[in-house]
Amino acid sequence: ADRGQTLKAFQEAEAYNGPSIIFAYAPCIAHGIDMSKTQTEQKRAVEAGYFPLYRYNPANEQPFTWDAKEPKESYQDFIKSEGRYKSLMKTNPSEAEALYEKAEKDAATRMSVFKAVGELLK
C-alpha cells in the first residue's frame, strides 16, 4: 500500500538483532479481484482501516511507529467489494449484514488500541 513504509519495515526487520516478523496484507484469488491490481487493493485496505500500517522496533528510541492515516474509505464498502465477503451475503444476507457491522466495530476498536499502545510506547 505504501512502498516507503514497506521498505522501512523490511530494513528495520533485517537490521534488528533478533527475530523479526512483518505482517502484510496479501490479496489472493479468493478476494475476487484482478490479481494485477493487488497493490490497489492493498491501498484500499489501508484507506478503509481494514489493515492499518504500523511498525514496532524495540531497538528504536520510540519503538512503535504509527504509519496509518485516519480511514478515508468506507470499511463496509471495502469488505463488500471482495468475493469472500460477497459469498456470505449471497448465502445469508441478514447474518452477513450483522457480521459486517461487527467487523467494522472491531476494526475501529483495533485501530483505537493500536493508537493507544503507540502513545504508551512513546
Name each model feature, range by range.
Residues 107-110:
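Hydrophobic, well-ordered beta-alpha structural blocks that scaffold small-molecule cofactor pockets
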Residues 6-95, 102, 112-116:
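Glycine/aspartate-rich loop-and-adjacent alpha/beta segment that forms the canonical ThDP
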Residues 1-3:
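Acidic carboxylate-rich catalytic motifs and surrounding loops in phosphoryl-/glycosyl-chemistry enzymes
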Residues 117, 121:
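Segments forming glycine/polar-rich beta-alpha architectures that bind adenosine-containing cofactors
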